């Protein structure tokens, strides 16, 4: 006969499976306990990440809109400062009406330039200053922008404020010590300003003095003729009347030739007539006798 084989009843198999399931469940619960303690922190981080992602998406959508690029009322808080009563019709600042929805609708519907003022019903436009106020402000000589105020008005020209040319002419002041030519300069200063430029181009020569009816020792006849040198270049005798000069005798500035050429008294040997050049050495070879008659 063989060995007897023991067969376990099915109830034991069922109990073993239940024990295995319970052990697995216990193991899973033990592993989840530390995760439950860290769960609030993870949840807070996840919520922050979600909020940041939604904020960036909202900002990107706002930046894409061109009509919302400027500051809004919530940022400036002007609507709270200048609110006023509801029934009042007082004008509000133009910055409060930039983002109103009716302004956008009206600006889209109306494209003509004539209807542009109607798109800003509550905006204060700058007004031009009256003529009296502008002229009163520009009356001062030390006004910085006086000409700008006059040019802005159509009826007033820039000629209303005369401009003085400070550097147009040179003004001379009289000094304490006066030279002999200063009396003549005083006469020229009396002339009008239009001839100032002409005065500087001319040379003021002093007038010749009239000593009297004395005659020149070189010209005993007093005809007013000038002797010309008889050298290589032939000059003609020119009368003084043809040169627009006074007919009176010239001032004796230089010493006579006889005094320089005859210091020892040889002038007595040379007669007053027309001696030859060899008999009168004081005259030299370059002189010729005076003509008998002058035209």
UniProtKB/Swiss-Prot annotation:
Modified residues (Phosphoserine): 256
One cellular component term from this protein's GO annotations in UniProt: extracellular space
Effect ascribed to mutating residue 254 to F: Abolishes binding to LCK and reduces binding to FYN
Listed Polar residues bias regions: 266-281
Alphabetic keyword roster: Adaptive immunity, Cell membrane, Immunity, Lipoprotein, Membrane, Palmitate, Phosphoprotein, Signal-anchor, Transmembrane, Transmembrane helix
Chain intervals for the UniProt region annotation (Interaction with LCK and PIK3R1): 235-238
Gene Ontology MF terms: protein kinase binding
Membrane topology term: Single-pass type III membrane protein
Post-translational modification as stated in the protein's UniProt record: Palmitoylation of Cys-28 and Cys-31 is required for raft targeting.
Modification sites for Phosphotyrosine: 145, 167, 200, 235, 254
Chain intervals for the UniProt region annotation (Interaction with CSK): 167-170, 200-203
Extracellular-facing ranges: 1-6
Subcellular location(s) per record: Cell membrane
Coiled coil region boundaries: none
Primary subcellular site in the record, as a coarse category: membrane
Subunit structure: When phosphorylated in response to BCR activation, interacts with LYN, PIK3R1, PLCG2, and GRB2. When phosphorylated in response to TCR stimulation and/or CD4 co-stimulation, interacts with LCK, CSK, FYN, PTPN11/SHP2, GRB2, PIK3R1 and GRAP2.
Name of this protein: Lck-interacting transmembrane adapter 1
Encoding gene, per UniProt annotation: LIME1
């Amino acid at each position: 006969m063989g060995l007897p084989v023991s067969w376990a009843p099915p109830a034991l198999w069922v109990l073993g499976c239940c024990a295995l399931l319970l052990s697995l469940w216990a193991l899973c619960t033990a592993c989840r306990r530390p995760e439950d303690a860290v769960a609030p922190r993870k949840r807070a981080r996840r919520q922050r990440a979600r909020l940041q992602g939604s904020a960036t998406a909202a900002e990107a959508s706002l930046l894409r809109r061109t009509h919302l690029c400027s500051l809004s009322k919530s940022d400036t808080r002007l609507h709270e400062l200048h609110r006023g009563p509801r029934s009042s019709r007082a004008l509000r600042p133009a910055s409060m009406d930039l983002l109103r929805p009716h302004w956008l609708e009206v600006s889209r519907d109306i494209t003509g330039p004539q209807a542009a003022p109607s798109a800003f019903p509550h905006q204060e436009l700058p007004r031009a200053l009256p003529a009296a106020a502008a002229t009163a402000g520009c009356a001062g000589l030390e006004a910085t922008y006086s000409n700008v105020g006059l040019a802005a008005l159509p009826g007033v020209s820039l000629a209303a404020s005369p401009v003085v040319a400070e550097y147009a002419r040179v003004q001379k002041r009289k000094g304490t010590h006066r030279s002999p030519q200063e009396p003549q300069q005083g006469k020229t200063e009396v002339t009008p300003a239009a001839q100032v430029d002409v005065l500087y181009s001319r040379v003021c020569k002093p007038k010749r003095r009239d000593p009297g009816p004395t005659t020149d020792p070189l010209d005993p006849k007093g005809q007013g003729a000038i002797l010309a040198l008889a050298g290589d270049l032939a000059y003609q005798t020119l009368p003084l009347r043809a040169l627009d000069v006074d007919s009176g005798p010239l001032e004796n500035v230089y010493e006579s030739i006889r005094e320089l050429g005859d210091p020892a008294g040889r002038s007595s040997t040379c007669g007053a007539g027309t001696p030859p050049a060899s008999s009168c050495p004081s005259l030299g070879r370059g002189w010729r006798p005076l003509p008998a008659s002058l035209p």
